[in-house]
Design a protein with these regions (language model features):
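Hydrophobic membrane-targeting and insertion signals
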Residues: 1, 70, 177-178
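Core segments of small alpha/beta cavity-forming domains
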Residues: 1-58
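Mixed-charge, low-complexity intrinsically disordered segments
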Residues: 20-23, 27-35, 85-139
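Short amphipathic beta-strand and strand-loop transition segments with alternating hydrophobic
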Residues: 57-68
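Residue-level signal for tight coil/turn positions that link beta-strands
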Residues: 68-72, 151
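A short hydrophobic beta-strand element
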Residues: 71-81
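Beta-strand elements of well-folded, non-transmembrane domains
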Residues: 79-85, 149-151
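Short beta-strand edge/turn micro-motifs at domain boundaries
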Residues: 97-107, 111, 115, 133-178
Length: 178
């Protein structure tokens, strides 16, 4: 588990398991949004969750020793980013254009559009699978995370610094100047 603060869980009225499940579902939805899948079925969500697990398994990082700077500790995390999401983003629109050019189904009804979206979802997930297999590691980056003592002997890290580590591990795309 993530080691959530018990007071935080109580305030939310959640258990660690239910909160972790919600976060996992939000990550699946974020992947579906990235892949432009509008109406993911349970099957598509399950496949997306499995692909995210594969992506997370590629995470490569080393956590250094804590250095006490006063009211807490700073921990350096050396991260080797994986470029899978950037590769997906780079290929997505071309893949969608090719899919649309070859799609012959009727999208004028709700049922027809749902069939289109399901077919696109399979193609988009296949693209993700392809790019995940091709993914390479980028140059190492060092991130510093401030860790504080939490209640009950737990430790806490600021959400912003953890988001920075996550963003470095899995860069989605670089904004291009126009």
């Amino acid at each position: 588990g993530r080691g959530y603060d018990p007071e935080f869980l109580t305030a939310l009225g959640e258990t660690e398991e239910s909160l972790s499940a919600q976060i996992a579902e939000e990550n699946v939805q974020a992947l579906c949004n990235l892949l432009i899948i509008e109406f993911p079925t349970d099957e598509i969500r399950g496949e997306a969750a499995g692909l995210l697990e594969e992506l997370y398994a590629k995470a490569d990082y080393t956590v250094g020793a804590a250095v006490p700077p006063g009211n807490g500790s700073e921990v350096e995390i050396t991260v080797r980013p994986v470029d899978a999401l950037a590769r997906v983003n780079d290929a997505l629109w071309e893949r969608l254009d090719a899919f649309n050019a070859g799609y012959t189904g009727d999208t004028s009804t709700d049922e027809g559009y749902a069939a289109y979206d399901a077919a696109w979802a399979e193609d988009a997930l296949a693209l993700f699978r392809e790019k995940l297999a091709e993914a390479e590691y980028l140059s190492e980056t060092v991130c510093t995370v401030t860790v504080l003592d939490g209640p009950g002997g737990t430790i806490e890290a600021g959400r912003d610094s953890l988001d920075t580590v996550y963003g470095v591990l899995f860069p989605i795309w670089m904004l291009q100047e126009t």
